[in-house]
Amino acid sequence: MSAKIENVKKELLSDNWYVLHKYTFDLKRKDGGSVQQMREVYDRGNGATILLYNRAKGTVVLTNQFRMPTYVNGNESGMLLEACAGLLDADSPEQCARREAVEETGFQVGEVKKVFEAYMSPGGVTEIIHFFIAEYHDDERHAAGGGIEDEDIEVVELPFTEAVAMIADGRMKDGKTIMLLQYLQIHRIMD
């Protein structure tokens, strides 16, 4: 069933870093009636994320960086352990995933596998994230990583079992990273 909307009005609220619009519209209900709704929609573009793993060592490579929204919402340090990720800009999802792996971790990986894509916060954000995994090897590290421009990213290599345990004990809070770790676990890629 597709939603039927009419009388859509769009108002620009902000275009400082990304774009925030207010939409007012009439939504046809399944009972035949309609209701007027208002939603603010944040458009930051689409992105890609990639989880690097090493079967032989039983490890994954993550990044640790400051994320202001987590700080505002109770994360005292603002630091977040996560799979590397970035916005597509003009790149394809795979190109973006590869670019972010090099920029953030220093690894220039070989084969990359797209595993799925998902809306991460569909109640207010347009962004679709493309999820990738890639096996890494120590000889594929061509740079230190750490990000670009004003990024200050720590590269963290962890045992896969510890990363999964961090989900259960609450230390792993990044949704995209949890999804990718569970993908490896469900598909027994690290066995």
Swiss-Prot record:
Binding residues for Mg(2+) 2: 100, 104, 151
Locus of motif Nudix box: 86-106
Swiss-Prot/TrEMBL cofactor(s): Mg(2+)
Annotated positions binding GDP-alpha-D-mannose: 38-40, 67, 85-87, 104, 127, 150-151, 176
UniProt-annotated binding residues for Mg(2+) 1: 85, 104
A molecular function (GO) term: metal ion binding
Cited Pfam families: NUDIX
Keywords: Hydrolase, Magnesium, Metal-binding
InterPro entries (UniProt xref): NDP_pyrophosphatase, NUDIX_hydrolase-like_dom_sf, NUDIX_hydrolase_dom
EC number: 3.6.1.-
Annotated Gene Ontology cellular component terms: cytosol
Enzyme class: hydrolase
Protein purpose: Nucleoside diphosphate sugar hydrolase that hydrolyzes GDP-mannose as its preferred substrate, yielding GMP and mannose-1-phosphate.
Cross-referenced PANTHER family: NUDIX HYDROLASE DOMAIN-CONTAINING PROTEIN (PTHR11839:SF18), UDP/ADP-SUGAR PYROPHOSPHATASE (PTHR11839)
Description of how the protein assembles with itself and partners: Homodimer.
Protein family: Belongs to the Nudix hydrolase family. NudK subfamily.
Domain topic, free-text comment: In the dimer, the N-terminal domains are swapped between the two monomers, such that residues of both chains contribute to the active site.
The protein's name in its UniProt record: GDP-mannose pyrophosphatase
Organism: Serratia proteamaculans (strain 568)
